[in-house]
C-alpha cells in the first residue's frame, strides 16, 4: 500500500509517482501538517514607519508579491522569491463560509487525495464540500443555488516539500537568517496558480522524474484587476538540468509525510 512506503526509490517510478501524487498527471494534450511552515503569496505590501525631517512617515517595508513563510507558533518571514524542492502533491476541495450571527468565518475542507476523481469526505460530514459529484453535462440548466455552490468550491493543489526563501526579511523589512530547506505545506487554490504549478508536476511525470529529484524556482507575476488592484500568481521555473541526491534526512522527511 502507498501509505506503507517510507523510503524514496528513484528506480521505481510508478510506485513512487503514485505516492508523490503525480501518477495521474497527463500532458496538456492528454500528518504532520500542523508542524509544517505554511507558504503563501503576500499580495499587499507591509507598511512601517520611518523618520523624515523629524516626522514619522509611512513607508513600504515589505513589497507586495513576496512569498510569505509562516512558521508554526513562530514568526513570519518574507522573500522576494523562493526555491522549493517538492516531495509530493495532494488534492482536496475547500469552500469559504462567511460567519453569521456569532459564528466565525471558516473553511470547509475535504480530506486529501492523490487525485480528484473520487468523492472526498469533508469536515462538515458531507462530500466534496457539498459539490455534486460526477460530470455535469449542462451547467446552465442547474438551479442557481447549485451553480453558486459549485463556483464557491475550489480545487486545491497541496504541495509538500522544502523551501528556501530568497533575500528573507521579517515583517519589518529587516534581513534575517532563515534556516535553509524549511519543510512546508502550500495550499494552492487560485485557478492560474493551480495550473502553473501543476505544469511543473506534469512535466516531471512526462519525463518520469520524481518531484524530490528536482527544484522549482519561484518568482511572482502581477495581475491587475478591473478596479486597479493588483494580485500576484506564482511564476515557477522547473530545473530539469540538475538531479538532486537523496539523503537520509530526505528519506526521514518523506516517511514523516507519508505516516
Predicted regions and their residues:
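Long, compositionally biased interface segments
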Residues: 196-259
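Short helix-loop boundary/capping segments
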Residues: 165-201
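Conserved, folded interaction/cargo-binding domains in eukaryotic regulatory proteins
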Residues: 146-153, 160-161, 183, 190-196, ...
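OB-fold ssDNA-binding interfaces and closely related basic DNA-contact patches used
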Residues: 2-176, 225-233, 237-245
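Intrinsic-disorder-associated interaction segments
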Residues: 9, 187-190, 194, 243-247
Amino acid at each position: 500500500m502507498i501509505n506503507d512506503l517510507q523510503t524514496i526509490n528513484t528506480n521505481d517510478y510508478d510506485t513512487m509517482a503514485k505516492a508523490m501524487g503525480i501518477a495521474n498527471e497527463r500532458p496538456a494534450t492528454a500528518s504532520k501538517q500542523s508542524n509544517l511552515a505554511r507558504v503563501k503569496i503576500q499580495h499587499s505590501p507591509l507598511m512601517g514607519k520611518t523618520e523624515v525631517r523629524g516626522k514619522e512617515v509611512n513607508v513600504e517595508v515589505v513589497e507586495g508579491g513576496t512569498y510569505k513563510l509562516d512558521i508554526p507558533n513562530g514568526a513570519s518571514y518574507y522573500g522576494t522569491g523562493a526555491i522549493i524542492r517538492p516531495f509530493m502533491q495532494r488534492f482536496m476541495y475547500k469552500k469559504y463560509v462567511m460567519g453569521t450571527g456569532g459564528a466565525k468565518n471558516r473553511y470547509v475542507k475535504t480530506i486529501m487525495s492523490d487525485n480528484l476523481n473520487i468523492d472526498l469526505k469533508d469536515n462538515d460530514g458531507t462530500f466534496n464540500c457539498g459539490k455534486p459529484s460526477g460530470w455535469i453535462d449542462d451547467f446552465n440548466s442547474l438551479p442557481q443555488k447549485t451553480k453558486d455552490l459549485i463556483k464557491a468550491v475550489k480545487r486545491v493543489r497541496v504541495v509538500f516539500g522544502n523551501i528556501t526563501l530568497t533575500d528573507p526579511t521579517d515583517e519589518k523589512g529587516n534581513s534575517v537568517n532563515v534556516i535553509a530547506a524549511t519543510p512546508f505545506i502550500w495550499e494552492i487554490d487560485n485557478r492560474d496558480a493551480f495550473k502553473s504549478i501543476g505544469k511543473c508536476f506534469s512535466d516531471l511525470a512526462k519525463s518520469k522524474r520524481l518531484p524530490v529529484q528536482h527544484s522549482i524556482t519561484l518568482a511572482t507575476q502581477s495581475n491587475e484587476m478591473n478596479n486597479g488592484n493588483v494580485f500576484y500568481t506564482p511564476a515557477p521555473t522547473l530545473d530539469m538540468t540538475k538531479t538532486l541526491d537523496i539523503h537520509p534526512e530526505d528519506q526521514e522527511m518523506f516517511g514523516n509525510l507519508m505516516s
